[in-house]
Amino acid sequence: MSFIAQLDQRFSPLWDRIRQHPFLLETRDGTISDEVFATWMRQDYLFVEAAIPFIAALLPKAPRAHWGSLAGVLQALEKELHLFEERAAEVGVELRGAPPSFTCHAYVQFLLSTAYARPYGEGFTVLYAAERAYHDSWKVVQEGIAPDSPWVPFVENWAGPEFAQYVAYLGGELDGMARETTPTERERMAELYRLTLLYEIAFWEMAHGAEGWPGVDQDMAGSTSGPAWNPDRARGPESAWADLARRIEEGGEA
């Protein structure tokens, strides 16, 4: 049994919680409130911005064979920011000005500390688990979302074939790396996999419950402006992951 298959079996209750989360089911069924979805958009926009330095921190540790794929991820994440900006403008949501929630902030710090302080294989495990969780989550939404829903572009981005190809590539690479590690190293990777799934569940919970920071009024919770990784609002017509998928298909690796 592959490393990922073992992890999926071991943590199947967490995968069930992710795929059955009310946020996803309500988005699929068209019953999610505009306010709840706007909360998710603002927080995930901050998360995608933070994912850029996460990937950048992995690059110096990565094997040469992964340089191209990680560079492609950086480009795709920038396009995802455009997607958020385009959708927010379409539905009248202001992305800027919302401080990170407690869960968003904690998840970002988990990403960055893993990338900077842990071996590459552990950071790559977190990358795979997070991307796989998003693919599986939006596949749930894809099963029943109305074609005219304003959230269809998010479904197309994360449930589409290009992103699926990227996630499959990450999975194959992770299984390959795991075969070259010790049992102790694999157990550390498994623990980070578990924590990533827990953070994914917590992120949906945060958005669905409009979570702030525990113990304080929200006007005390933080800054009124986030980082500006991507001020350009232009957006191309294709999936953010199309360029990377083409590189994987044409070269056998990204």
What are the residue ranges of the model-derived segments?
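Intrinsically disordered, low-complexity terminal tails and inter-domain linkers enriched
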Residues: 214-253
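Non-transmembrane amphipathic alpha-helical segments
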Residues: 52-55, 84, 138, 170
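Long amphipathic all-alpha helical oligomerization modules
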Residues: 163-194
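Alpha-helical bundle segments that constitute or directly flank the non-heme di-iron/ferroxidase center
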Residues: 12-17, 31-61, 125-135, 204
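Acidic, carboxylate-rich catalytic segments that either coordinate divalent cations
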Residues: 190-219
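Short alpha-helical hairpin
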Residues: 8-32, 51, 169-180
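Active-site-proximal alpha-helical scaffolds that flank and shape metal-associated catalytic sites
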Residues: 42, 65-165, 194, 198
